[in-house]
């Protein structure tokens, strides 16, 4: 050590005297009387410098990439570090041509598809290739998601920890209208409209059952998987699913006659039945289940779907339980009340006190226009109605900065497009399909995003920031997917077949150059969300 220190100082092979008691007391003597003090002090300085340099060298052994992708020792909820090393992942369902597809992963923290060094050009879910992954049912808290592809009817389990396909959990008829998966994963439900079947995959019995319900096109299930409701297109009937006791009836016909069901399956020793639910309905198209598990809000589309009056029908969940076996002709009546919604309703979301309802209202000129209605859940009364994007509203979620986001499809056929065609240059003629609403005020001021307008007298044109492949300067197209990247002030969307990112601060759009996909973006999911409510 001493020789190495001396060599560093340039003293050749000169030896350094051993410490002695006099050296330890030298601080009390005049400097001129002790020339070795300079050597001792210099030696200490050099040793300190060497120690600092060696420490710095050790600490700098890691590359910059190590810090880019370094996870904390204790991850949130003990979640494993994924193979991609990305901490904030958004998964995108992409179809190349309708028959070949993929599930791509992008870095939602940096809004890039590659790693920082660009040594890995992209990330994706391994083992997945179904053609049209149009529906992602995401459960980040459970470290998985389910992807339904309408090209082959497959419902695939995606393992978020390994970023790989865990295989198909079942196959519904291709082109099914809707699927429903509860977070218990005990059943999977599929509404197969073309076949007129409501298919139930029961993981508790390893059985699959198909209930004959002509034109069934929607199915909804609550969080506990105790209530499953089915809806029929162009109908005012709502069905619930219930399970018979083991060997309760010998035949299908006996079960139908005893319970008043529309169908029971299988034909011998039936297990499941579907029965109509008493209540007031007008083209029911969806169900929102209350946060406390007591109420089911049935969304009646009304005139938007060829009926008469849009409304919400409130039902008690207790009588709808799948273990409640009805007796014909008397059925348990779960209805609480029916609340008309003048603005229309096809999508709903609650914060615990207010139910936000998105839909369309028929206008005197025969066109529809979009509205957001608010309902006080304590009094079951409509308290407000606000203009939003036109189209069929099916996406709604909360996000950062106390915002609410609403997405719709086929927005270029409503009142806003008519205003645009008439030369209106205000936001009233913005016919895009995404609306941002800032909550918390006495009144709400929704804004359609991106904000665009055509040129007028003294008004310059404002076009979409990042046009899609069709290069339409004012319209992105239908919004088919949206997810909230929690705590990062952004939402990701599948908007007109491409990925677009919006700020929850002001609704502005982030650059999508490095997350844009080759093919058609169909749906998105935030894989690392803190809760399941971010998707």
Model-identified regions with their sequence ranges:
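Bacterial Sec-dependent N-terminal signal peptides
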Residues: 2, 21-22, 28-35, 53-92
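A short beta-strand motif characteristic of beta-propeller blades
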Residues: 65-67, 114-128, 164-170, 205-211, ...
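Residue position within the beta-strands of beta-propeller blades
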Residues: 92, 147, 190, 230, ...
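Structural motif
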Residues: 98-107, 153-158, 196-200, 236-243, ...
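Short loop/turn segments that connect beta-strands within beta-propeller blades
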Residues: 109-110, 159-163, 202-205, 243-246, ...
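Solenoidal tandem-repeat scaffolds enriched in leucines and small polar residues
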Residues: 203-349
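Blade-level signature of beta-propeller repeat domains, shared across WD40, Kelch, NHL, RCC1
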Residues: 493-535
């Amino acid at each position: 050590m001493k020789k190495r220190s001396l060599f560093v100082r340039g003293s050749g092979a000169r030896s350094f005297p051993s410490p002695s008691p006099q050296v330890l007391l030298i601080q009390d003597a005049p400097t001129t009387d002790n020339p070795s003090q300079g050597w001792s002090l210099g030696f200490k300085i050099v040793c300190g410098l060497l120690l600092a340099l060696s420490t710095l060298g050790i600490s700098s052994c890691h590359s910059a990439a190590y810090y880019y992708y370094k996870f904390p020792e204790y991850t949130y909820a003990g979640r494993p570090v994924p193979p991609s090393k990305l901490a904030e992942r958004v998964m995108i369902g992409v179809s190349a041509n309708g028959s070949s597809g993929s599930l791509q992963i992008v870095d939602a923290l940096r809004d890039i598809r590659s790693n920082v060094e660009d040594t890995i050009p992209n990330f994706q879910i391994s083992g997945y290739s179904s053609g049209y992954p149009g529906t992602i049912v995401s459960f980040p808290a459970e470290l998985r998601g389910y992807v339904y592809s309408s090209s082959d009817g497959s419902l695939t389990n995606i393992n978020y920890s390994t970023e790989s396909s865990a295989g198909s959990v079942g196959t519904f008829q291709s082109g099914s209208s809707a699927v429903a998966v509860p977070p218990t994963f005990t059943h999977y439900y599929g509404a197969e409209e073309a076949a007129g079947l409501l298919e139930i995959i029961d993981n508790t019995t390893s059985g699959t059952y198909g209930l004959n319900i002509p034109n069934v096109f929607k199915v909804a299930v609550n969080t506990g998987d105790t209530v499953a409701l089915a809806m029929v297109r162009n109908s005012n009937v709502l069905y619930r699913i219930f399970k018979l006791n083991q060997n309760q009836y010998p035949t299908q016909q006996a079960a139908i006659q005893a319970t008043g069901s529309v169908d029971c399956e299988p034909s011998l020793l039936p297990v499941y039945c579907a029965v109509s639910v008493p209540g007031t309905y007008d083209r029911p198209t969806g169900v929102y289940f209350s946060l406390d598990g007591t109420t089911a809000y049935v969304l009646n589309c009304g005139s938007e779907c060829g009926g008469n009056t849009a409304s919400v029908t409130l039902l008690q969940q207790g009588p709808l339980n799948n273990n409640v076996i009805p007796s014909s002709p008397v059925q348990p009546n779960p209805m609480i009340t029916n609340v008309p919604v003048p603005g229309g309703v096809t999508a709903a979301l609650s914060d615990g006190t207010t139910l936000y309802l998105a839909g369309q209202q028929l206008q005197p000129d025969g066109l529809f226009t979009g509205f957001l209605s608010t309902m006080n859940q304590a009094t079951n009364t409509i308290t407000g109605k606000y203009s939003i994007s036109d189209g069929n509203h099916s996406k709604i979620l909360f996000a950062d900065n106390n915002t609410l986001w609403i997405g719709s499809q086929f927005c270029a056929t409503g009142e806003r497009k008519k205003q645009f065609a008439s030369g209106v240059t205000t936001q009233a003629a913005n016919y895009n399909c995404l609306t941002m609403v800032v909550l918390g005020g006495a009144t709400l001021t929704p804004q359609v995003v991106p904000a665009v307008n055509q040129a007028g007298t003294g008004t310059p044109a404002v076009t979409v920031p990042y046009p899609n492949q069709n290069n339409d300067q004012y319209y992105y197209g239908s919004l088919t997917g949206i997810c909230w990247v929690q705590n990062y002030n952004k939402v990701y969307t599948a908007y007109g077949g491409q990925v677009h990112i919006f700020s929850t601060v002001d609704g502005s759009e982030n650059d999508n150059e490095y997350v844009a996909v080759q093919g058609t973006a169909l749906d998105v999911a935030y894989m690392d969300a803190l809760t399941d409510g971010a998707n």
